[in-house]
UniProtKB/Swiss-Prot annotation:
Residue numbers binding substrate: L22, Q23, G24, R37, T102
Cited InterPro entries: 7-CO-7-deazaguanine_synth-like (IPR024924), Aldolase_TIM (IPR013785), rSAM (IPR007197)
Record PANTHER family: 7-CARBOXY-7-DEAZAGUANINE SYNTHASE (PTHR42836:SF1)
Cofactor note: Binds 1 [4Fe-4S] cluster. The cluster is coordinated with 3 cysteines and an exchangeable S-adenosyl-L-methionine.
Location of the Radical SAM core domain: 28-251
Source organism (scientific name): Methanopyrus kandleri (strain AV19 / DSM 6324 / JCM 9639 / NBRC 100938)
EC number: 4.3.99.3
Annotated gene: queE
Binding site for S-adenosyl-L-methionine: G104
Record Gene3D superfamilies: Aldolase class I
Keyword Iron on entry: yes
Protein name (database record): 7-carboxy-7-deazaguanine synthase
UniProt keyword list: 4Fe-4S, Iron, Iron-sulfur, Lyase, Magnesium, Metal-binding, S-adenosyl-L-methionine
Function: Catalyzes the complex heterocyclic radical-mediated conversion of 6-carboxy-5,6,7,8-tetrahydropterin (CPH4) to 7-carboxy-7-deazaguanine (CDG), a step common to the biosynthetic pathways of all 7-deazapurine-containing compounds.
Quaternary assembly: Homodimer.
């Protein structure tokens, strides 16, 4: 583990897995990236596609592009351990320059350890993409000067229990971000559309773009409804499903 202030050990990171793949969502879809998936999340979204990552593992699986497990890393682990693994993967595969921090929810990790990880990654020349549910506005200023790009998954009241105030919480989070940012809004069913309209207007007011309307995998949507929603505000709004669910390129 790393060392915090006054020589105290930095709490470790709950890493679920580290793997190489193509980005399947949002602005960088199709780009070769390394992914650090953390375990633990503050939400219980109905459409969550990685529910297993809510719970921690004793050992994080480190996978190559083929899906082959290269090694296992004891959890919790130090930031320097994660960086060392990524450097080894880069030497083996040499096809990625971006590290995506995903989950779970990265911002529930011990702050000192997450900060150190991002700093070490950037020192190594990696671009850092932070994927967050944007529901923890108090954490926004902490990561604003660290991550190169922030991907905000804006939550709607219909996404899960006790989420009525989450669109406002997400907007408060984004108000505190000056780094490059883009937003995703997942559409699960018809109930999402009314809430999505309000979210789009709020994102437009903040100048956040591009905005990706993401039909949930397996859900059904009317083209006219998607067309109308995408044209609601004068901004860069696109409809883009999870490509990695259409073409299974996440190693397992």
């Amino acid at each position: 583990m790393g060392t915090g202030g006054r020589g105290r050990p930095t709490p470790g990171l709950n890493v679920y897995e580290v793997f190489l793949s193509l980005q399947g969502e949002g602005k960088f879809v199709g780009e070769p990236q390394a992914f650090v998936r953390f375990s633990g999340c503050n939400l219980r979204c109905a459409y969550c596609d990685e529910p297993a990552s809510r719970s921690s593992r004793r050992r994080a699986l480190i996978r190559r592009v083929s899906g082959e497990v290269e090694l296992e890393l004891p959890v919790p682990c130090g930031p320097e351990d994660v960086v060392e693994v990524l450097v080894e993967l880069e030497d083996l595969e040499d096809t990625f320059g971006t590290v995506s921090l995903t989950g779970g929810e990265p911002l529930v990790q011990p702050w000192g350890a997450l900060k150190e990880l991002i700093e070490r990654l950037r020192e190594r020349g990696f671009r850092v993409l932070l994927e967050t549910n944007a529901s923890l506005p108090d954490r926004a200023p902490l990561i604003d000067e660290l991550a190169d790009v922030v991907s905000a998954d804006v939550k709607l009241p219909s996404h899960g229990p006790n989420m009525d105030d989450f669109p406002d919480r997400c907007l408060r989070f984004l108000e505190r971000i000056s780094a490059e940012v883009y937003a995703k809004v997942v559409l699960v069913d018809e109930e999402c559309y009314q809430h999505a309209e309000s979210a789009l207007k709020g994102l437009h007011r903040l100048g956040v773009e591009p905005i990706y309307l993401q039909p949930a995998t397996g859900s059904e949507h009317d083209l006219e409804d998607l067309w109308e929603l995408a044209g609601l505000v004068n901004a860069d709004v696109r409809v883009l499903p999870q490509v990695h669910k259409l073409v299974d390129f996440i190693p397992r």
